[in-house]
Amino acid sequence: MEENQLTCLIVGETPAAQFLGWRLSLSNSFIILVSQYVSSDELVAWKSTKLGANFYTPNILTKDIKELHHKLKHNGANTYSIDIVLVSAISLQSFETTCRLLSDYTNDNTTVLISTDFGCELEPIAISYFGGKCKCVISISCEVECRQLSLGSYALVNDDQCVITLGLTYCDANFEASPTILENTKAASLELQGIKGSNVRRFLLGLTVAKWMKSKLILDPKQMALKMWELLIPKISLNILSIIYEQFDYEKMLENKSTEIIFKDLVKELLGICFAQCGSKIARFLLVKSQGEEEINFGKIVEYCKGKKLQLINSTANEHPEYLSLPFEPYCFYHRFEYPAQILLHQPIILAKKYGVSCSNLNFLYGFYTRLLTLSGLSINGGRCEHALSMLDSRIGGGINVASGINSGQDFTDGDNEDQDKGKNRVDKNVKEGSFISLTQRFTMTSPLGVNDPALPADLEKLYLGAEYISNCDANTSGGQKRVKSPTKADTGYDDKHLPDDTIHTFEDEYLADEDDFSCLGIDKRSSTKPTKPLEKFGVVAVPHFIRRFSIKRSSKDKSNDMKRPYTTSSLELQLRSNHFMFAKEYQDLHRQLYYEVKPRTQSELDARRRNYSELESQMWKIKHRFNIHRGALPRPRTNPYELLLDHIDVLNRGNTGDILRFTTSRYGGVDTYDSILRDQSTIMELLDKRCAYSPPVLFDNEAKERDHDRDCYQDYNHDHRSH
């Protein structure tokens, strides 16, 4: 480590904390990063429309804060003198734990920065652990739009401006009985003055090398607290509410009177907590009447959020499935990324109780959002929630225990066919056409490895869920066999079929339409059927299929064995996302089903079995042929104008190490595959024009003349023949 080099210890999972680490690394700072969301190669990738793609490797990286002891301690003494400690936690519990553990690595010259992007007055908690072990504790707010794309991959969505604000969010008047906090106020005031050589000054100089990054030092704690409440109130009152109501158009959401009442009550409670905590009001959200009276202007809060959203739309490629233009909280909820929701919702409740302010609506919102995360298989405190399913899920499918059936691999018999027939003409009003039924209502949170793997994050389990199976069977019954249903399904969508207009949309029909049917094989020994194995049992690594974002419409009368593609995607998008690694699973499934029965002993038994399984055998050889085309053993037939474009994309993918463009969300930014296609559009169109024509244009003219000559000769021959 160089002399006078700024040493920063960054602990946190939020994109803002990762962003600060990235920018500090470019200023030659010594970065010690603690984050579980970094890949094993220790590379942190950032993408930006203006800055391009950037990678950096922290000087020291650990995934768990407890591992710091082996890297920062030697014979009980600290190996490095830490200048800056940046803490950004997911929950209040993890925040306290992090502060307690980090206090062993600080010294009298260390400045502790607490991320207050999701909470106000967090410094007293940190001071209780760092008091006497550091120079001071200061709050930091980073107003920048960052999004996590995947493990160790982030996007800087809005790189036009970034404001870094430092200050204190607590008021001394509320802590007169705490000398430690009062001492921190004095030390922080000196540090915030930006004296030459101070840690804060060196920290900001490293960040503001880029001209679009600005910094603010607020010496008045009341103004800093007001600034934080100005950011927090719209997040809680509108963004969290939009997640619950699944409506991201704020004006449409507030057209509902009950929703509007909840929104206004939340704003009133939050402004009341703000006034009790810092003794000031947010002038931006107030309307001053002619008599000098002030009242809350709810429209300004809506306009504030709409303005932020418009900035995102103007600066992002708003394409499925990233949804980068969504506000930070809905984006994280959609992608199942962790963010400090517990601090965002629970810290105001703690402050309300401390200062004697009513917060009944905020309490209800916190409980409701916590339950919503629980049903999604996540915990508001971070990590996975073990109780992902509701007890009401057992009612799905006419009283069938879906959870136990899927976990055990048990087949569903046709005992509910009568109920299904009775309900054919009934349309569930709660399930609209093309609507989406949550996976948490249909599947348990099982590991893609076939066992409960506690090491697998819940968000990955959510993506993998149901992606390791594929249907290959006809829904028709053959040989008079009884229809049975398999509980597993995943649609690769190779076929592009249109659906009939008489599609019935009831809850039972949509659920049963997603079930596979093995009776097409003519197998009547279902009692001995083995549970369906996941892909990994065949040595195939499953990549998330993201099936929960698609809605498959299927008619209850549809008996074809064709796989239905998601109607929300285009043909090209579907071919790009088709899972070629499923070939081995398809082939193994058909092979197992084809030779399911005991090996025939006589030729007549063999012939009978071949007649029964002729269609299945044909499917198996088609899959084998398709697989040979995929691996290049056979040429791919030119059946549509997309084929050459797909070849071009394959070249781009294979030229990128590790197939990153295929399997990660890198369709955004300067390295985007689609962006490359647009740049090469003229070349691609010339390629299509040349390759789609099987012969040069001159030969076409010669062939046309030859065909005309042959046709004239043939007509002359027929005329002469008839004349005779």
Swiss-Prot record:
Protein's UniProt keywords contain Cytoplasm: yes
Any one GO CC term of the record: prospore membrane
One annotated GO biological process: ascospore wall assembly
UniProt keyword tRNA processing present: no
Keywords from the named record: Cytoplasm, Membrane, Sporulation
Region: Disordered, residue numbers: 407-427, 477-497
Protein name as it appears in the record: Outer spore wall protein 2
